[in-house]
């Protein structure tokens, strides 16, 4: 294979990929006298920042305007925040096989599981991120029920947002 521009070992791949090495990034938040120092494993995406800022300053969300993202205020305040039932989607319709080596795909993360649908190749990969953070053990043939559940979510989400293939 070609050398990657980045290395996020032990995570798989790097910038431009929907594997963990390309999408998992640290988030640091500092607010003196408001947020206690600590560490959280709460799953957060970029769309969660705006609802969180509104929540922190006491402004109510307008559901017709704030369609994406959820507040992670509870996590910042040191309270448990269970996002395990919340699906998070990524869509990358423009492959870059020569620059980053990635292929067009739609990805969903739900709890510990992550499914990548390489729709142009007709290939699906399924991983349990709690047991396999490096995404080396494809479970799509071993866990067909979980694969099919997440694949249906991907298809429905793509249709709901009119995602291009």
What annotation goes with each model-predicted range?
Residues 55, 78, 142, 153-156:
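Residues within well-ordered alpha-helical secondary structure of globular protein domains
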Residues 84, 146-148:
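Cytochrome P450 catalytic domain signature, combining two hallmark sequence patches
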Residues 1-20, 34-36, 42, 47-129, ...:
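C-terminal cap/loop subdomain of S1 sulfatases and analogous C-terminal strand-loop tails that border
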Residues 132:
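Intrinsically disordered, low-complexity polar regions and short flexible loop motifs
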Residues 149-165:
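Charge-dense polyanion-binding interfaces
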Residues 24:
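Conserved nucleotide-sugar donor-binding catalytic segment
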Residues 27-29:
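Short glycine- and hydrophobic/aromatic-rich loop-to-beta-strand nucleating segment
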Residues 137-145:
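Active-site-proximal N-terminal segment of extracellular/periplasmic enzymes that hydrolyze or transfer
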């Amino acid at each position: 294979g070609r050398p990657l521009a980045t290395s996020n070992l032990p995570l798989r791949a790097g910038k431009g990929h929907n594997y963990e090495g390309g999408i998992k990034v640290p988030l640091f938040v500092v607010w003196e006298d408001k947020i206690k120092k600590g560490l959280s494993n709460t799953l957060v995406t970029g769309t969660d920042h705006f609802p969180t800022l509104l929540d922190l300053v006491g402004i109510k969300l307008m559901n017709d305007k704030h369609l994406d993202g959820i507040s992670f205020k509870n996590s910042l305040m040191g309270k448990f925040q269970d996002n395990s039932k919340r699906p998070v989607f990524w869509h990358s319709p423009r492959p870059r096989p020569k620059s980053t080596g990635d292929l067009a795909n739609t990805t969903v993360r739900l709890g510990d599981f992550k499914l990548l649908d390489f729709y142009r190749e007709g290939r699906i990969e399924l991983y349990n991120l709690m047991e396999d953070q490096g995404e080396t053990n494809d479970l799509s043939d071993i866990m067909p029920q979980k694969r099919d559940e997440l694949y249906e979510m991907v298809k429905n989400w793509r249709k709901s947002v009119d995602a291009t293939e």
